[in-house]
Every structure is written in C-alpha cells, then in structure tokens.
Design a protein with these regions (language model features):
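Acidic, histidine-bearing metal-coordination/catalytic regions of metal-dependent phosphoesterases
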Residues: 1-30
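A generic local structural motif
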Residues: 5-7, 34-37, 70-72, 151-155
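Short acidic-hydrophobic surface loop/beta-edge motif
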Residues: 5-9, 124-130
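Structural motif
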Residues: 16-18, 46-47, 132-134
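Short hydrophobic segments within beta-strands
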Residues: 21, 51, 86, 135-137
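Active-site beta-loop-alpha junctions enriched in small/polar residues
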Residues: 24-25, 90, 137-141
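Core catalytic region of metal-dependent phosphoesterases/phosphodiesterases
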Residues: 26-128
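Binuclear metal-dependent hydrolase catalytic cores centered on His/Asp/Glu-rich metal-binding motifs
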Residues: 118, 130-155
Length: 155
C-alpha cells in the first residue's frame, strides 16, 4: 500500500511549461529521425515527464549505436529541461524469443541517472524547486511479471 500524505505549498503564481509522454518504445528498428521531431516538441518545456517504456525492450541497451543515440538524445533534452523518468515494464525486462527475463540493465539506467538534469525513479525519485515538487514512483519487476504469471496459474 502506498501512503500518500497531503502537503500544501504556495509555489508562486508563475506559469509552468511541462510535457508528459510515455511509451516511446525505442528499439533497434526505431527511426532515429523521430528523436529530432520529439526534441523539437519538447525543447521549450521546463519540465519533461517520461511515463515509462522509454525502451521497447532492453535489447537496445546492448546495441552500442542505438544506446549512444538514446543517451545523446537524453543529454540534449536535459540541457534545456529537467527530465523525470519513471521506468515501465519494457524498461525493466529483457525479451528473449518472446519470453521475459529478469531485469539486468541496471548499468544502463545508472548511466542515464548520472546525466545532469535527469531524475530517474530508481535512483533519485524526489525533486523540488521554487515551482514544482515531484515524487517519482516505480513498480518493481515482480509487479509486472511474477504476479502476472502466478495469476495465470490460478486460472
């Protein structure tokens, strides 16, 4: 159970420019020109929220060219904006011939979390400035996969 406490803050009357997107599903087959289109949509936002499934599968983590392009995209975006990333089920699991295997891409996400301006749910899940307060939540691997398989066995 998640305990949510109510907090009330007077953050001022300034406008906040933020964007939310999710389910990019970046993969080996992803057309990288789309990253430029996405950047052009995001570049004027102060805060960007990526709500899971940035990756299609963690296979892209092992493709050095694709991995580097995604890292460079995140670095470029985070130079202009604060970027908050919550990991989704595709970000956590490695697909291998239509089967899911336990998460082992921690090195990639640790690298992402070290980019200035990036806040990743796994490593730095709280952010506050004079305009916004952010709490990032992330479900663990078992939430997506273990429980799903156990419930199928009950049927």
């Amino acid at each position: 159970m998640i305990d949510i406490k109510k907090h009330y803050y007077n953050m001022g009357n300034e406008d906040i420019n933020m964007m939310l997107f999710g389910d990019l599903h970046y993969s080996d087959k992803f057309n990288d020109k789309k990253l430029d289109l996405i950047y052009n949509k995001l570049k004027n936002s102060e805060y960007i929220f990526i709500a899971g499934d940035l990756l299609d599968s963690t296979d892209v983590v092992n493709n050095i060219d694709k991995r580097d392009k995604l890292i460079k995209f995140l670095e470029k975006v985070s130079k202009k904006s604060k970027v908050f990333i919550t990991l989704g089920n595709h970000d956590l699991a490695i697909r291998n011939k239509h089967k899911k295997a336990k998460d082992d891409n921690n090195e990639f996400w640790l690298e992402v979390s070290r980019i200035d301006g990036i806040f990743l749910s796994r490593y730095n899940n709280y952010y506050e400035d004079d305009k916004i307060i952010v709490y990032l939540l992330e479900q663990d691997y078992d939430y997506y996969y273990k429980n799903k398989h156990e419930s199928r066995e009950l049927l």
